[in-house]
């Protein structure tokens, strides 16, 4: 079978080398004679692997020593409620930048746990397409407990490439762009990310939390969502998702072998530029995001005629190009090109798009 390329927004494509290693080790991990899924999370061999994975992640992101790195359950949505319960009091005001579907979900969840959620800014229509309001137009609270934003919205493919300059501790939902390029972690109070896009399989999340923000959780926060408790127990207060942690560790080593985040950033920008250049030059395809705010991870595009969508998707599937259907809220197409997507996959998609346009455009 020829190689397939999975453009799904998540769960997403994983590096082939990682999958092959996991396959080889599935029945006999690390010489233990059993699968990694069958070993206790308290076993010294497993604990060593878990700590090594954490250190590799710290190395990749240059995480300062005054931050905890937590491996948690519940995915990104679990963090929507964990964040306000851990770093804001019930009577607090918090600022949220509303840049899309996932920001909206986070806002509605936060409203359950704090007195006021202030929407500081949002997406607007500009002369060059959809864009995020300029920071000078944001309406920030004077004493916000934190400022939350999602730097990369997967549904619309809109991104904020500059870290906001605000007084409050910054919380970022990086579920879809973590590890895609270098990042200055020291500018953030909390970074969290669901795993199923650039880290590993679905069902768990990473949270990177500044230690100075810990220690004052709301009374009702569940123990497994308590950042300080999980940090104290090395993310093993409850039995973690042992296989996902292991697989994430393999991904971190793969990223190091690729040259780290500087190399990945260059590769990802190149892949995205290939797609955007093709779409912008075409009269058959279009992208409605202002180029200054375009995502390098998720590239939505529309066909000239909606009636051709089903035919486009079936033809793509026949060519081994999977997961291109756009989100149900917006329709059209979407190519998610996370770290594991090789440039060859993007080139295969472009060849198919050009051929489809020649035949039906």
Swiss-Prot record:
N6-(pyridoxal phosphate)lysine: residues carrying this PTM: 197
Pfam family, any one: Aminotran_5
Record keywords, A-Z: Amino-acid biosynthesis, Aminotransferase, Cytoplasm, Pyridoxal phosphate, Pyridoxine biosynthesis, Serine biosynthesis, Transferase
Compartmental location: Cytoplasm
Gene Ontology, cellular component aspect: cytoplasm
Cofactor detail note: Binds 1 pyridoxal phosphate per subunit.
Cofactor section: pyridoxal 5'-phosphate
E.C. designation(s): 2.6.1.52
Source species, domain of life: Bacteria
Annotated pathway: Amino-acid biosynthesis; L-serine biosynthesis; L-serine from 3-phospho-D-glycerate: step 2/3; Cofactor biosynthesis; pyridoxine 5'-phosphate biosynthesis; pyridoxine 5'-phosphate from D-erythrose 4-phosphate: step 3/5
Enzyme class: transferase
Disulfide pattern: none
GO biological process terms, semicolon-separated: L-serine biosynthetic process; pyridoxine biosynthetic process
MF term (GO), any: O-phospho-L-serine:2-oxoglutarate aminotransferase activity
Annotated L-glutamate binding sites: 42
PANTHER family assigned: PHOSPHOSERINE AMINOTRANSFERASE
Subunit organization: Homodimer.
Record-given protein name: Phosphoserine aminotransferase
Native source species: Idiomarina loihiensis (strain ATCC BAA-735 / DSM 15497 / L2-TR)
């Amino acid at each position: 079978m020829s190689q397939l390329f999975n453009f799904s927004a998540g769960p997403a494509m994983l590096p082939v080398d990682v999958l092959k290693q996991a396959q080889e080790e599935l029945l006999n991990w690390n010489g233990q004679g059993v699968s990694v899924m069958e070993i206790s999370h308290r076993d010294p061999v497993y604990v060593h692997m878990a700590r090594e994975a954490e250190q590799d992640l710290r190395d990749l992101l240059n995480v300062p020593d005054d931050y905890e790195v937590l491996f948690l359950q519940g995915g990104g949505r679990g963090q929507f409620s964990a964040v306000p319960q851990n770093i804001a009091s019930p009577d607090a005001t918090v600022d949220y930048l509303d840049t899309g579907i996932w920001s909206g979900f986070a806002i509605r969840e936060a409203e359950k746990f704090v007195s006021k959620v202030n929407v500081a800014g949002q997406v607007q229509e500009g002369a060059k397409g959809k864009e995020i309001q300029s920071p000078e137009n944001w309406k920030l609270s004077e004493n916000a407990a934190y400022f939350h934003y999602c730097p990369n919205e997967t549904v619309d493919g809109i991104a904020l490439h500059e870290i906001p300059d605000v007084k409050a501790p910054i919380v970022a939902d990086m579920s879809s762009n973590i590890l895609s390029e270098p990042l200055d972690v020291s500018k953030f109070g909390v970074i969290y990310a669901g795993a199923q896009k650039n880290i590993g399989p679905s069902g768990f999340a990473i949270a990177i939390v500044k230690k100075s923000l810990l220690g004052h959780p709301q009374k009702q926060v569940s123990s497994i969502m308590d950042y300080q408790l999980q940090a104290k127990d090395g993310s093993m207060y409850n039995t973690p998702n042992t296989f996902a942690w292991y697989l994430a560790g393999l991904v971190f080593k793969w990223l190091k072998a690729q040259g780290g985040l500087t190399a990945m950033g260059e590769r990802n920008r190149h892949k995205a530029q290939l797609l955007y250049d093709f779409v912008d030059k075409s009269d058959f395809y279009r992208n409605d995001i202002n180029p200054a705010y375009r995502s390098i991870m998720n590239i939505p595009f529309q066909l000239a005629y909606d009636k051709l969508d089903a035919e486009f998707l079936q033809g793509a599937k026949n060519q081994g190009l999977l997961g291109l259907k756009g989100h149900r809220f917006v329709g059209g197409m979407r190519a998610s090109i996370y770290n594991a997507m090789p440039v060859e996959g993007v080139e295969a998609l472009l060849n198919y798009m050009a051929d489809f346009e020649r035949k039906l455009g």
